[in-house]
Amino acid sequence: KARPDDIEWLYELNRKSFLKVVIRQFGKWDEAFQRQIFFSKWEKPRPAQIIEKGSDRVGVVILEQLEDCNWLHEIQICPNYQSHGLGTALLRDLLADARSRGVPLCLQVLHANQDAKRLYARMGFQEIERLANHFLMEIS
């Protein structure tokens, strides 16, 4: 579980994960605005699980089990641990959990985050809806 003292590390992970995507989609990264958005999400406790490999923190998963779906708020892997199958393995575990509950695994992905969208499509996620800034995707 994420602890309050993890919050700055989580922000840096968020920044590393989304900086290029946000610039591609919105044209710039406004540090003050991004910090405000990020920290406002943490004003109430979030179901965050820090992913560790050995003694290293390498990512985070924020999953909420709702009545009609498992909602994947975030899955972020440190850039130097990406492309090694960790995200795919985590998604498989999350999908198995959703299937055991008999609900789909749902998420949103920014339009400009094509690497993530390709990963989700490869895993079998279907695009359900195109929103203003995101694709809504799910897999059963």
For each of these PLM feature ranges, what is it?
Residues D56-E64, C69-Q76:
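Conserved beta-strand in the GNAT
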Residues F39-I50, G59:
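A short helix-loop-beta-strand connector motif used in the catalytic cores of GNAT acetyltransferases and
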Residues I77, S83-A96, R118-R122:
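Conserved acetyl-CoA-binding loop-helix of GNAT-fold acetyltransferases
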Residues T88, H111-L136:
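Conserved active-site alpha-helix within GNAT-family acetyltransferase domains
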Residues R15-S40:
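Conserved GNAT-fold acetyl-CoA-binding loop/helix
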